[in-house]
Swiss-Prot record:
Membership in a protein family: Belongs to the Mediator complex subunit 5 family.
Superkingdom of source: Eukaryota
Key words of the record: Activator, Nucleus, Transcription, Transcription regulation
Localization: Nucleus
GO cellular component: mediator complex
Entry function: Component of the Mediator complex, a coactivator involved in the regulated transcription of nearly all RNA polymerase II-dependent genes. Mediator functions as a bridge to convey information from gene-specific regulatory proteins to the basal RNA polymerase II transcription machinery. Mediator is recruited to promoters by direct interactions with regulatory proteins and serves as a scaffold for the assembly of a functional preinitiation complex with RNA polymerase II and the general transcription factors.
Name of the featured protein: Mediator of RNA polymerase II transcription subunit 5
Record organism: Aspergillus fumigatus (strain ATCC MYA-4609 / CBS 101355 / FGSC A1100 / Af293)
Pfam families noted in UniProt: Med5
Major localization listed first in the record, in broad terms: nucleus
Subunit and partners: Component of the Mediator complex.
Gene Ontology molecular function, alphabetical: transcription coregulator activity
InterPro entries (alphabetical): Mediator_Med5_fun
């Protein structure tokens, strides 16, 4: 029997009898003495045994390979090369679904990932490589792996699919990410640096550059921190796939890399101070436009900011919320902005605190915290009732303290008897009745009219909005599942006519949670041509669609925010093409027939018949509205249709069951008027009749107002442009006057013209100078945090305007320069906290990406969210890569940059061992009869196992198997869990080179 055969038999028996790592080490040592074998043949025998077994994942196999590496039988580079030879990463698309059951190979990716991660650990601890030659060999092996994964991506990429290529397989994503981390770790070792810095390995660097060029574009979708790390590596060593000119000063490059490591290690962190301005800015950012409130992200940020200091957390978030209200009053913010600020304080914070108390089981002296927070407020902004009669100024916030305290008492944070003591006078109201979500759901199910009563209370300041919204959204989800569209229509109508209620909804729910079931219902709407009455169906469809459109346009939501994941979605097609007319020859036979039927019904027959609607589903009708308008208006403009007939026909669209379609009609009409080179009199008359109808029913009037709210802003811009081209026209102003009350519908964080003019004409450098001036005033205010004084004027719209108009690449350097000056002036810790908060503050453009880091979507079911702009965090990461160069010219700036980078990472660090608390769920299911609820009363989504089909028994068995495997390898599996960030791993890899004491070896759980 030959050596490979003997070894193959040995490996087969070891796997069959589940021989642990220690015994395997001893047995393999004995066999090696009797039957020597080359390392390549040894690995071939082991991996061929795996192929023959056809087992998708065997935890012993990586342990055996690791054992062979530790005992010096095989080299790491040879392991990686042999692993690739037998990997199923080479499988073609038609074989990918079989995962080795029918093909020549078994599915190997889970084993591949584990072996590569073991290699990463070995590299990070300094165990590998020992020589430059081994480092070169590992680099070449990584290069081959990267090309193999890139090839897999190309062969599985389908431009028509949201999730294709590597994103179509979680295992390939994990393999891809592990390779990048391994490359970064190897490049940070002493031997890795020597290889990359030497001029004798140009061939390797050319190939490495080619591999990075293939890797980095794909990395954007997987991990931005990893992409930034490898991009910095590419720039430092000029790894672009081309040979470096001979004149390059390589020794200087080598010194720069060593200096980079030494400089960053030499930067000492100062004291961490949580400035008063920090949370003031953060809450302003959450609420200044579309409410960007995610409980998981907020808890994580607060936990990172305050650690276990719950008293400070409660006191400072309360103080900041009152400060935001005070600032809004002094800045004369709009009533809708003041309403959002107020609702966050009164409706959000009390149940948020109650849920936090219930979930942490920590005793917090709430009355003391509230008392301290109230003592720090400006008494002129929040006067008592006795003071308000003496004051001549604005007393709009005089009852806010009382509302908040009663909401706290309703949630059992404080006893009702404490309210008078905290107010310093007798309260002017009584304790409101506390609501429970489940009870409200039962009430609505028993009496659907109860839903509208509750929706009316969403805007009340009694601390009950969270329970109401939880109940309403749950009922809506149930109605969508049951297709009970009549009751759902009434709820949607009640919500869509109350824009401020939509704002409160987003304080407690993200848009996808509310809208995804509605969009799914609209997409799958069942249409039966024999169902009887059709007008009620159009009515129900239109009401549901109108609520989706109201959310979409009020908050400028993208399809991903609505929960739309399919390119075939009706809602997506309507949003993209609903206001675009089609040429007749582009319509299919059914569309032509439907168009003819609707034209006949509107302009020839005496009304819209059941026959017309039965032949055309609501989905088909909405997609034809723009074409219907186009053809009808063209007929009128060419004299084929009288204007009065045209006007009378279009007035049918003012009926409630068709009114939502007017959104797309008005949008098309505005575009048509704006594009016209001829006299626009006829379309302007039509527009006036639809915007300001002579008669409209009471029911339709509410829907019409919502329609105008949605369409008004775009129409106004188009009409003003037309008026500029035709200054003598008198038929435009009446339309603009009718649109005027609807222009403030959007809530997207955009700046007012007067604000922008003030900032951009700032005497000290325009918009950037005004941002720096605001920064200075916030730092100055924070130097005396206990003083009862009004906060400095601030709106996060200023920073948003800077990022949107100038770009983050210009805003961040200005912030860093100001931070540097404040550091020189002795205000470094305060300024550092403020700058870090500005960078961490949520933005609408990046919010879904940030949410995905806390609650990842399944890439197999929906597309991963994307960020459309370069953020302050992105620029900070890129600037951090240039610290070595900056330190040579401006050491203080480099130090400030390093500290800022660390502080931002600390504030945004993902939770490691803290469960992901679904605070909304806790809030809704808590009994308001007492704070001391047990854990059994709360539904905590601690692990998300249920969402992935893993039951408690399965999870326990998996953990036991991993623990056993780890114990066999002599490792501790208590690990940090799967929440460890890539930066943590990369930083550990950097620090561990020659410094094993910096590396946490308890990493088993990561893999």
């Amino acid at each position: 029997m030959t050596s490979p055969v003997q070894w193959g038999t040995f490996f087969h028996q070891c796997l069959l009898h589940r021989i642990d790592a220690n015994e395997f080490r001893n047995l393999s040592k004995l066999l090696l003495q009797k039957c020597p074998i080359a390392e390549t043949a040894l690995l071939d025998a082991l991996l061929q045994t795996r192929s023959e077994s056809r087992i998708k994942w065997d935890p012993l196999l990586p342990l055996y390979i690791d054992c062979l590496c530790r005992t010096g039988r095989v080299r790491t580079s040879t392991v990686l090369t042999s692993l690739l030879k037998y990997s199923s990463i080479h499988d073609k698309p038609q074989l990918s679904t079989s995962e080795g059951k029918d093909g020549s190979k078994c599915y190997t990716l889970m084993t591949d990932i584990r072996v590569i991660q073991d290699t990463m650990l070995s590299v990070s601890t300094g165990s590998t490589p020992k020589t430059n030659a081994e480092a070169v060999a590992i680099f070449f092996a990584i290069i081959d792996w990267i090309h193999a994964v890139a090839s897999w991506h190309n062969s599985h990429f389908d431009p028509g699919q949201h999730s294709s290529g590597i994103m179509s397989s979680p295992d390939v994503v994990s393999l891809f990410e592990s390779l990048g981390i391994l490359l970064a770790a190897l490049s940070g070792t002493g031997k890795g640096l020597e290889v990359l810095s030497a001029d004798s390995h140009e061939g390797l660097k050319v190939k490495l550059g080619q591999a990075l060029s293939a890797y980095l574009p794909l990395c954007v979708e997987v991990s931005l921190p990893l992409r930034n790390r490898l991009d910095g590596l590419q720039k430092e060593f000029n790894l672009y796939g081309e040979r470096v000119p001979k004149s390059l000063d390589v020794p200087m490059m080598e010194n720069m890399n060593v200096n980079a490591l030494q400089f960053e290690a030499s930067v000492m962190d100062g004291p961490v101070i949580n400035s008063r301005a920090g949370l003031y800015v953060f809450i302003n950012a959450m609420l200044v436009g579309r409410p960007l409130v995610d409980d998981g992200m907020l808890i994580n940020y607060l936990a990172n900011r305050y650690g276990g200091h719950y008293e400070a957390l409660v006191e400072e978030i309360l103080t900041a919320s009152f400060d935001v209200l005070s600032n809004g009053m002094y800045r004369n913010e709009s009533s809708r902005m003041m309403f959002v600020f107020r609702s966050f304080l009164v409706n959000k914070l009390p149940p948020f605190f109650a849920a936090m108390l219930a979930s942490t089981m920590v005793s917090i002296p709430m009355e003391m915290c509230i008392s301290h927070a109230l003592s720090r407020l400006d008494p002129n902004t929040f006067p008592s009732f006795s003071q308000m009669f003496e004051m001549q100024g604005n007393t709009v916030l005089s009852d806010v303290r009382q509302e908040f305290l009663f909401a706290c008492a309703s949630h059992k944070l404080i006893p009702e008897s404490s309210i008078e003591r905290l107010l310093g006078e007798n309260p002017m109201q009584t304790l409101p009745v506390g609501y429970n979500k489940d009870e409200l759901v039962s009430q609505i199910n028993a009496n659907p009219e109860r839903a509208e009563q509750l929706i009316n209370e969403i805007e009340s300041m009694e601390g009950n909005a969270g329970a109401i919204i939880g109940a309403i959204t749950e009922v809506m989800h149930n109605l969508c599942n049951q297709k009970e569209t009549m009751t759902l229509k009434n709820i949607c109508n009640s919500l869509s006519r109350r824009p401020q209620a939509l704002d409160v909804v987003l304080i407690f729910r993200n848009p996808k949670q509310v809208l995804q079931p509605l969009c799914a219902l609209l997409d799958s709407w069942h249409w039966d041509e024999d169902q009887g009455e059709y007008q009620p169906v159009y009515d129900e469809f239109g009401s549901i669609l109108l609520l989706v459109l109201a959310f979409k346009y009020r908050f400028d939501l993208r399809p991903a925010d609505l929960g739309i994941s399919s390119s075939d979605s009706f809602v997506l097609r309507l949003l993209e093409r609903g206001s675009c007319s089609q040429k007749l020859d582009a319509l299919d036979e059914k569309q032509n027939k439907n168009l003819g039927s609707w034209i006949a019904a509107l302009f020839i027959a005496e009304g819209i018949s059941e026959e017309t609607m039965s032949a055309c589903s609501p989905q088909e009708f909405y997609l034809l509205v723009a074409t219907l308008f186009s053809q009808s208006l063209e007929a009128c403009e060419t004299g084929k249709l009288e204007f009065d007939t045209l006007k009378g026909g279009f007035e049918y669209l003012l009926e409630p069951f068709l009114l939502p379609s007017l959104i797309f009609a008005l949008t098309w009409l505005g575009d048509h008027i704006w594009e016209m080179e001829l006299d626009p009199s006829i379309p302007l008359k039509v527009l006036h009749s639809l915007v300001n109808p002579s008669s409209i029913s009471g029911e339709a009037r509410e829907i019409h107002r919502t329609v105008l709210n949605i369409a008004a802003r775009t129409l106004e811009e188009q009409l003003k442009d037309v008026r500029t081209r035709h200054p003598s026209r008198t038929d435009i102003k009446p339309i603009l006057d009718s649109l005027e009350p609807c222009l403030s519908f959007q809530l997207v964080g955009s700046s007012h013209r007067s604000e922008l003019e003030g900032w951009t004409t700032h005497s000290s450098g325009g918009l950037l100078g005004s941002i720096r001036s605001t920064f200075q005033s916030l730092v100055l205010w924070s130097t005396n945090p206990e003083v009862s004084m009004a906060p400095p004027p601030y709106t996060h719209r200023q920073l948003i305007a800077g990022v949107r108009m100038l770009g983050a690449s210009r805003v961040l350097p200005a912030l860093i320069e100001e931070l540097k000056l404040q550091t020189e002036a002795g205000n470094g810790p305060l300024a550092l906290d403020l700058a870090a908060t500005l960078i961490c503050a949520p933005m609408a453009e990046t919010f879904s990406v940030e949410q995905n880091s806390h609650q990842p979507v399944d890439p197999n079911k929906e597309a991963l969210p994307r960020c459309g702009i370069l953020t302050l965090r992105d620029v900070l990461a890129l600037q951090h890569e240039n610290v070595p160069k900056i330190s040579e010219k401006d050491p203080l700036r480099a130090e400030v940059l390093v500290r800022l980078y660390r502080r931002v990472n600390a504030l945004l660090a993902p939770p490691s061992q803290v469960p992901n608390l679904d605070v909304n769920n806790i809030i809704q299911n808590m009994q308001l009869g007492g704070v001391g609820v047990g854990a059994g009363q709360m539904e905590l989504d601690a692990t998300g196992a249920a969402d992935h089909g893993v039951g408690p028994d399965d999870a326990e068995n998996i953990h036991r198997m991993i623990d056993n495997a780890a114990a066999a390898a002599g490792l501790d599996s208590s690990g940090t869990g799967l929440d460890t960030s890539i930066d943590d791993v990369l930083n550990a890899a950097d620090m561990a080179v020659g410094n094993p004491e910096f590396l946490d070896l308890d990493m088993e759980g990561m893999f």
